[in-house]
Amino acid sequence: MTVKLDFEECLKDSPRFRASIELVETEVSELETRLEKLLKLGSCLLESGQHYLAAGRAFVVGICDLARLGPPEPMMAECLEKFTVSLNHKLDSHAELLDATQHTLQQQIQTLVKEGLRGFREARRDFWRGAENLEAALTHNAEVPRRRVQEAEEAGTALRTARAGYRSRALDYALQVNVIEDKRKFDIMEFVLRLVEAQATYFQQGHEELNRLAQYRKELGTQLHNLVLNSARQKRDMEQRHVLLKQKELGGEEPEPSLKEGPSGLVMEGHLFKRASNAFKTWSRRWFTIQNNQLVYQKKYKDPVTVVVDDLRLCTVKLCPDSERRFCFEVVSTSKSCFLQADSERLLQLWVSAVQSSIASAFSQAHLENSPRGPGQVSGYHAPGSAATLACGGAARGRESGGVGQVAAQVQSVDGNAQCCDCREPAPEWASINLGVTLCIQCSGIHRSLGVHFSKVRSLTLDSWEPELVKLMCELGNVIINQIYEARVEAMAVKKPGPSCSRQEKEAWIHAKYVEKKFLTKLPEIRGRRGGRGPPRGHPPVPPKPPIRPHSGIVRSKSECPSDDMGSLHPGALLFQAAGHPPSLPTMADALAHGADVNWVNVGQGNATPLIRATAANSLLACEFLLQNGANVNQADSAGRGPLHHATILGHTGLACLFLKRGADLGARDTEGRDPLTIAMETTNADIVTLLRLAKMREAEAAQGQAGDETYLDIFRDFSLMASDDPEKLSRRSHDLHTL
């Protein structure tokens, strides 16, 4: 304990004691002033803190309001929710800090001012009152004359009483001064300590809250970076679009109505003037839409649509050249007619054409819905690899007979296909279309992870299937492919995984089987053991028509090498020979498994490829198999003729249709400067001419941004089905048309 006033000096009442008293009183007075100032500053701090809390909570509410603006965005909603919750937690911690600060001020500083200093002031007042009494007693005692004995005794008694009172009060004052000195130190240090502890708690809570969001903040930063990049790209695209539209506007070009093909039929939108049916015949501008086989209009977006024609099949459209206003046309239904006006002659023609096309589309759709299915339609048709000539205007819709379940039943009926090719799980519902095998769902996922250069996976029940692809799957199958890829499994004593094996075991097996090809044997051994394969189980191919000229460079359909010598060929040559007449799909699969280049060039045969050789053999399945395994549909021979040229020269309509679906180049010319259409016209093959012209028309429409007609796809579907199910009929048809 610090002793500011010595008790001995206090009893002596020396000048040193009085000087100490004055110094202590000055210090205590200064302490009181500063403590009162600190209390005022603390009040201001607490008041400002409360204002900060109120403003912070209002700010958080404002952030929450941003999430309610516009359509909901999951990413922004999650971000705002997480951060507003975090901000609220921080504000709660700040409120706790303010409460702790206020409590500390009241408990330490305010108590010190009100209680500690009050006792000091009372002791000081008593001390100085005793000092004054002592001073008066001393003065009176000193002034009493010697002759006044009685008065002198009374003065002495009063002096002793005053001195005793003074000393008692002086000791009390000294004690109070010493106590207040220590209390000042303790209370101030405790106040600061509690304040710092409250601050530490506040910042620790904030640190924990930030740590809780650390991972999310990192992920959000990455997402925002990607969003900024995408936004920059979109901004650049919009600026380019803006420049183009501005140039178009400066060029005086009029805006075109929106024209597109959707799931509900042909759709066209744009502004037209409509003549009222009242007596005034007023004209008003409205937004018209052709959709769902209806013609409707509305004034504002929120207004309900008004139906002009409920069913486009029950109306017609005609021009109004006699009308007083220009660019008018009339839509006439069974119950009423509607006069409409476009902004220009070109827009008039577009609208009339759109209405006519919509009427035709409505009739076509009704016909397709009511028409019975043909018995030969065993599968859906979908051309995932179609060229631009077929792909524009939407993907081809599948044509199915009895549903895609019939495809699964047909493929699974092949010997060995009722079980998964790799793990023997029953009833597989997936397939690898370039390998020709069926797979369970787990093995199909592993095959998909290998990449399409190893395996192209398709569902037997969920996807649409081309008829030629279904026949290809039935021609190959698990037994044949496993004879190739598992030829040495027994000799190597390798255990094949079963249905109950883990995914890791199946994945290791599939990787070793198809990627590393550990179980393949040498070509001569495979050929000797399996003995090759005769003609496919489909219809025998029709003998090819002779080429246009003897030096045309067409690959001869007759095999140049005896079958006994095929085992000695390298894989590319083996693939080439196996694609000839009659093609052997197992041998082709064998060659591809041993690394044959699907686009291998036979220099001795005029740079012909296996696909060109299969074309000469008129084998739809061989061509489909090669295309599924990456054959180039536009690779030409030394005469500059690709597969489409050869199919056209030989009159193989089904193959020409297949190559067009797979993106064959319509404008490719041979060394004589002839494209496929020129050759087809020279050979007077009407079917191929029709296909080529339809493809060219579709290509031209796609270049102009127009949606195509379903007629194109219907014709290609019909030719595909005919080539797959009845190739002899297609050949006779081509021959009959050729001889007319």
From Swiss-Prot:
Activity regulation info: GAP activity stimulated by phosphatidylinositol 4,5-bisphosphate (PIP2) and phosphatidic acid.
A single GO CC term, please?
recycling endosome membrane
User: Mutating R448Q has which effect?
Assistant: Loss of catalytic activity. No loss of accumulation of coat proteins on internal membranes upon overexpression of Acap1
Q: Where is the protein found, in the record's own terms? A: Recycling endosome membrane
Instruction: Cite the entry's keywords alphabetically.
Output: ANK repeat, Endosome, Lipid degradation, Lipid metabolism, Membrane, Metal-binding, Nitration, Repeat, Transducer, Zinc, Zinc-finger
Q: Where is this region: Required for formation of endosomal tubules when overexpressed with PIP5K1C?
A: 1-382
In this chain, the stretch annotated as Disordered covers 525-562
Please give one Gene Ontology molecular function term for this protein. Answer: zinc ion binding
Q: Which Pfam families match?
A: Ank_2, ArfGap, BAR_3, PH
Renumbered residue ranges of the record's region Required for interaction with GULP1: 405-740
Kindly list the residue ranges recorded as spanning the membrane: none
**Zinc: is it a keyword of this entry?**
yes
Q: What is its main location?
A: membrane
- Domain (PH): residue spans on this chain: 265-360
> Does Lipid metabolism show up as a keyword for this record?
yes
Domain spans labelled Arf-GAP: 405-527
Q: Where are the ANK repeats?
A: 606-635, 639-668, 672-702
**Zn fingers (C4-type): where?**
420-443
Q: Give the BAR domain ranges.
A: 1-226
Q: Which PANTHER family match?
A: ARF-GAP WITH COILED-COIL, ANK REPEAT AND PH DOMAIN-CONTAINING PROTEIN 1, CENTAURIN/ARF
Quaternary structure note: Banana-shaped homodimer laterally assembling into tetramers, the tetramers further pack helically onto the membrane. Interacts with GTP-bound ARF6. Interacts with third cytoplasmic loop of SLC2A4/GLUT4. Interacts with CLTC. Interacts with GULP1. Forms a complex with GDP-bound ARF6 and GULP1. Interacts with ITGB1; required for ITGB1 recycling.
Other notes = Cells overexpressing Acap1 show accumulation of an electron dense coat containing Acap1 and Cltc on internal membranes as well as accumulation of Tfrc in pericentriolar recycling endosomes. Adipocytes with reduced level of Acap1 or Cltc fail to transport SLC2A4/GLUT4 from recycling endosomes to the cell surface upon insulin stimulation.
The entry's free-text remark on domains says: PH domain binds phospholipids including phosphatidic acid, phosphatidylinositol 3-phosphate, phosphatidylinositol 3,5-bisphosphate (PIP2) and phosphatidylinositol 3,4,5-trisphosphate (PIP3). May mediate ACAP1-binding to PIP2 or PIP3 containing membranes. Only one PH domain of one ACAP1 dimer inserts into the membrane, while the other PH domain acts primaryly to interact with adjacent ACAP1 dimers. The BAR domain mediates homodimerization, it can neither bind membrane nor impart curvature, but instead requires the neighboring PH domain to achieve these functions.
Return the protein name.
Arf-GAP with coiled-coil, ANK repeat and PH domain-containing protein 1
According to its UniProt entry, this protein's organism is: Mus musculus
